[in-house]
């Protein structure tokens, strides 16, 4: 694998997108629900606060902890994508490109939304 600036940028964007997909996106909620449960409580001011309760023990609890931590998930996503690049480079290149484009599109959308609100 050749490591250059473009590779680092593409991998970074791909890891960003994959980690957000796993930790935050609604489409992955059914997967996350296998490992943790979201609880809601009202605080003293009447605001609803959501917190996560990890399910199970052992591997299940480990995955639940992982999926509740964006930074932790990002490290594992980076490892997964680098391993894919080493083992199945052709398929990994397409996956990384797809995730990188989606990640950059998400960043652009956030910036444009904030810009339009001002």
Curated annotation (Swiss-Prot):
Residues that span the membrane, as ranges: 8-28, 62-82, 92-112
Subcellular location, principal: membrane
Subcellular location: Cell membrane
Keywords carried by this UniProt record: Cell membrane, Membrane, Sporulation, Transmembrane, Transmembrane helix
Annotated InterPro entries: Mycophage_PG1_Gp7
Residues of the signal peptide: none
Protein's GO biological process: sporulation resulting in formation of a cellular spore
Membrane topology: Multi-pass membrane protein
Any single GO CC term annotated in Swiss-Prot or TrEMBL for this entry: plasma membrane
Physiological role: Involved in sporulation.
Family recorded in the similarity comment: Belongs to the UPF0713 family.
Name of protein: Sporulation protein YjcA
Organism: Bacillus subtilis (strain 168)
Gene (UniProt): yjcA
């Amino acid at each position: 694998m050749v490591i250059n600036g473009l590779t680092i940028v593409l991998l970074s964007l791909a890891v960003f997108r994959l980690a957000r997909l796993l930790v935050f996106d609604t489409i992955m909620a059914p997967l996350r629900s296998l490992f943790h449960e979201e609880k809601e409580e009202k605080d003293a001011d009447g605001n609803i606060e959501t917190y996560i309760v990890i399910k199970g023990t052992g591997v299940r609890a480990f995955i639940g902890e992982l999926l509740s931590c964006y930074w932790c998930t990002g490290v594992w996503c980076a490892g997964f994508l680098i391993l894919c690049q080493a083992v199945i480079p052709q398929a990994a290149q397409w996956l990384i490109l797809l995730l990188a484009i989606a990640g950059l599109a998400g960043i652009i959308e956030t910036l444009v939304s904030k810009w339009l609100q001002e």
